[in-house]
Amino acid sequence: ISELSPNFCEIYNQAYIAEQTNLMQICGTGYRKSLEFLIKDYLISITPEDQHETIRNKFLNNCIRDNISNINIKTVASRAVWLGNDETHYTRKWEDKDINDLKSIIELTLHWIESEIRTQKLLEDMPEFR
């Protein structure tokens, strides 16, 4: 993941530091921002170069809806955005969820992205039965 999205790693780690120093009003915003970099960097890595600028400028929800085909990534990333948005907006929609739920869903999103990348590499290395 650090190769795919170094900005994700940096932003996530800064959000974690904010959380550890009890800056609870800003750490969620950082986690939400890190998610945006993770998703967009992932999409940029799998799309043709002529689409990169479109992805950079598109709203995150639209990127997930329009550009992610893997149902697992799409499903968990959407929910991570929902919780991340609760950290940035005045009114929470998911009052029974907190920062730990957001981090857990980001971790799950990471898992599915890593699995897809590793599977793709395996299929490239072993395209067919011999």
Language model regions located:
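Short, charged amphipathic alpha-helical segments flanked by flexible coils
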Residues: K40-S78, W82-L83
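Short, hydrophobic, well-ordered secondary-structure elements
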Residues: A15-Y16, L23-Y42
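Short, conserved alpha-helical segments within structured domains
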Residues: G30-Y31, R56, L60, L102
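Alpha-helix C-capping/helix-to-loop hinge sites
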Residues: A18, D41, N67, E87-W94
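Amphipathic, non-membrane alpha-helical segments in soluble helical-bundle scaffolds
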Residues: I1-S5, Q20, M24-G28, N70-A77, ...
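Amphipathic, well-ordered alpha-helical segments in soluble domains
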Residues: I11, G30, S34-F37, R79-L83, ...
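Charged alpha-helical initiation segments
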Residues: I1-Q25, W112, E128
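Charge-enriched, short contiguous segments at helix-coil
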Residues: T75-R130
